From Swiss-Prot:
It is found in: Cytoplasm; Nucleus; Cytoplasm, P-body; Cytoplasmic granule. The modification Phosphoserine is found at S4, S320, S494. The keyword Transport does not apply. The gene is Mex3b. It comes from Mus musculus (Mouse). A zinc finger (RING-type) spans 550-590. Keywords: Cytoplasm, Metal-binding, Nucleus, Phosphoprotein, Repeat, RNA-binding, Zinc, Zinc-finger. This is RNA-binding protein MEX3B. Phosphorylation at Ser-494 creates a docking site for 14-3-3, which stabilizes the protein and modulates its ability to bind RNA. Residues 320-331, 362-371, 420-442, 519-540 have a biased composition (Low complexity). The keyword tRNA processing does not apply. Residues 395-404 have a biased composition (Pro residues). GO terms for molecular function: GTPase activating protein binding; RNA binding; zinc ion binding. It holds the Pfam family KH_1. Residues 98-159, 192-253 form the KH domain.
Length: 601
């Protein structure tokens, strides 16, 4: 330092002067030079003192700069939401202890372009030379930035810019989603309504679908907004939209549940969502236009009076089958094995209002049974396999206009033969687990009644023109011309496929020629034939399950039935031989038969 330097110079000068003095014996000029040197040194010292460079001041000057760099500050930077936090932090953005403390995983947004170099938290820390603490789940979305003042200010600007950019992108994304047809939120338009659709707990996930695909599809198809119930709330879907769209959405939900569950909804008091204050729409009759039993997926028929207060799905329960249409002992189509009067009274609620044709069902425990409901304009046919058919109805052929010659005009009786009276015909169908077929029974009327025509087209004609009488389609054997062979029996043999029938409803396999009975039949024979039909159906079902052999020849397959008793235990050849006898009668019930018909299973 200058002070020590000048001290050394003074010591060296004094030593030099002493040396010069010691050698001054030879000359006397040494003292003058020493004084000049001292003056020069003193002048230099004065100059240094004027500049202020002493030892203490120099030390403080050099120590001030490091002390200024060590001054840090901390600032809190809030963002709008935790989604902004996730976007700014990025995937695995937190490092070490800080990333673990946040407690939630961050997924990147693929559509978000980088707003700045270093938008993620690690790059932002490196760029701004600051420490940024990310918020913990459950806390306020606030970043804590620590560092120098200018670095903290830069980090703050970066975080706020990233948050604003993410807000703009999210707003534009929601706008595009709304324009593309998705439902962004509950609408507030006038005329819209909100209904609640209650479903069983176990089918909520079925309605929502995988990742919400099913409920989204229903929303888009019906143009409604549907709020899905949470796990801890009641299983009620809130549907908002125009009234007709809301009804469509409810029907879509119901149809989806019925289609996926087979329509089997166990109705208990704890889980009775039909009568729980919410209109779900699983009503069998759909208001005032119910179409009778088995009409959940068929078109409603206004001619049938609905029966309120029933739980429709209880009639489709079955212990061994999960498909709609499997009739158990509790069925609308008939009673149990005994066919009690209670079942008949239940059926009377759904029978067509026509005395000419009615159908009853003989249910055998858990056997599948197909019930048919014929009306003037529609025939509702359940699905053969018991599965849900959305449109199982068909339009039969129209009735022939008056004056048109009938197919079997050659068998018309004379007008003096008596007026035609309605005949109550019953169709009982039985089924086994291996094969399902139908046995048809046509018992006659009273002793004084003349059998009417059972052809579907003529029935329609009679209902449209009640004042006209319908002639017979086929006479009994003792009245037919040419007693050698019955005309209709020959027709069955020559036309097995039924292609020459007059009406398309029969060509579809729903029926064959349905002739009347001879006028000589008595009420006793008709009652015995109808009473034996139940046992014969059961026995025939067991026989078909075992061997399916003819009960006469035990060789050919059972494909024919006798009319009117309906026993389907014979092959076509044996049935024809029975009809060709002089006094044809059924070998089982000993009832007089008129013809044999082929059965199409």
């Amino acid at each position: 330092m200058p002070s020590s330097l000048f001290a050394d110079l003074e010591r060296n000068g004094s030593g030099g002067g002493g040396g010069g003095g010691g050698g001054g014996g030879g000359g006397g000029s040494g003292g003058g030079e020493t004084l000049d040197d001292q003056r020069a040194l003193q002048l230099a010292l004065d100059q240094l003192s004027l500049l202020g460079l002493d030892s203490d001041e120099g030390a403080s000057l050099y120590d001030s700069e490091p002390r200024k760099k060590s001054v840090n500050m901390t600032e809190c930077v809030p963002v709008p939401s935790s989604e902004h936090v996730a976007e700014i932090v990025g995937r695995q953005g937190g490092s070490g202890r800080d990333g673990d403390r946040r407690g939630f995983s961050i997924s990147p947004t693929p559509s978000l372009e980088p707003w700045l170099p270093g938008c993620k938290i690690k790059a932002l820390r490196a760029k701004t030379n600051t420490y940024i603490k990310t918020p913990v789940r459950g806390e306020e979305p606030v970043f804590v930035v620590t560092g120098r003042k200018e670095d903290v200010a830069m980090a703050r600007r970066e975080i706020i810019s990233a948050a604003e950019h993410f807000s703009m992108i999210r707003a534009s994304r929601n706008k595009n989603t709304a324009l593309n047809g998705a439902v962004p939120g509950p609408p507030n338009l006038p005329g819209q309504t909100t209904i609640q659709v209650r479903v069983p707990y176990r089918v909520v996930g079925l309605v929502v679908g995988p990742k919400g695909a099913t409920i989204k599809r229903i929303q888009q198809q019906t143009h409604t907004y549907i709020v899905t119930p949470s796990r801890d709330k009641e299983p009620v879907f809130e549907v908002t939209g125009m009234p007709e769209n809301v009804d469509r959405a409810r029907e879509e939900i119901e149809a989806h549940i019925a289609l996926r569950t087979g329509g089997i909804i166990e109705l208990t008091d704890e889980n009775d969502f039909h009568a729980n204050g919410t209109d779900v729409g699983f009503d069998l009759h759909h208001g005032s236009g119910g179409s009778g039993p088995g009409s959940l997926w068929s078109k409603p028929t206004p001619s049938i009076t609905p029966t309120p207060g029933r739980k429709p799905f209880s009639s489709y329960r079955n212990d061994s089958s999960s498909s709609l249409g499997s009739a158990s002992t509790d069925s609308y189509f008939g009673g149990g094995t005994s066919g009690s009067a209670a079942a008949t009274s239940r059926l009377a609620d759904y029978s067509p209002p026509s005395p000419a044709l009615s159908f009853a069902h003989n249910g055998n425990n858990n056997n599948n049974g197909n019930g048919y409901t014929y009306t003037a304009g529609e025939a509702s046919v359940p699905s053969p396999d018991g599965g849900p058919e959305l449109q199982p109805t068909f339009d039969p052929a129209p009735a022939p206009p008056p004056g048109t010659p009938l197919l079997w005009a050659q068998f018309e009786r004379s007008p003096g033969g008596g007026s035609a009276a309605p005949v109550s015909s019953s169709c009982s169908s039985s089924a086994s687990s291996s094969a399902s077929s139908s046995s048809v029974v046509f018992p006659g009327g009273g002793a004084s009644s003349t059998p009417s025509n059972a052809n579907l087209g003529l029935l329609v004609h009679r209902r449209l023109h009640p004042g006209t009488s319908c002639p017979r389609l086929s006479p009994p054997l003792h009245m037919a011309t040419g007693a050698g062979e019955h005309h209709l029996a020959r027709r069955v043999r020559s036309d097995p496929g039924g292609g020459g029938l007059a009406y398309a409803a029969y060509a579809n396999g729903l029926g064959t020629q349905l002739p009347g009975l001879p006028s000589s039949d008595t009420s006793g024979s008709s009652s015995s034939s109808s009473s034996s039909s139940s046992s014969s159906s059961s026995s025939s079902g067991l026989r078909r399950k075992g061997s399916r052999d003819c009960s006469v020849c035990f060789e050919s397959e059972v494909i024919a039935a006798l009319v009117p008793c309906g026993h389907n235990l014979f092959c076509m050849e044996c049935a024809n031989r029975i009809c060709e006898k002089s006094e044809p009668e059924c070998p089982v019930c000993h009832t007089a038969v008129t013809q044999a018909i082929r059965i199409f299973s």
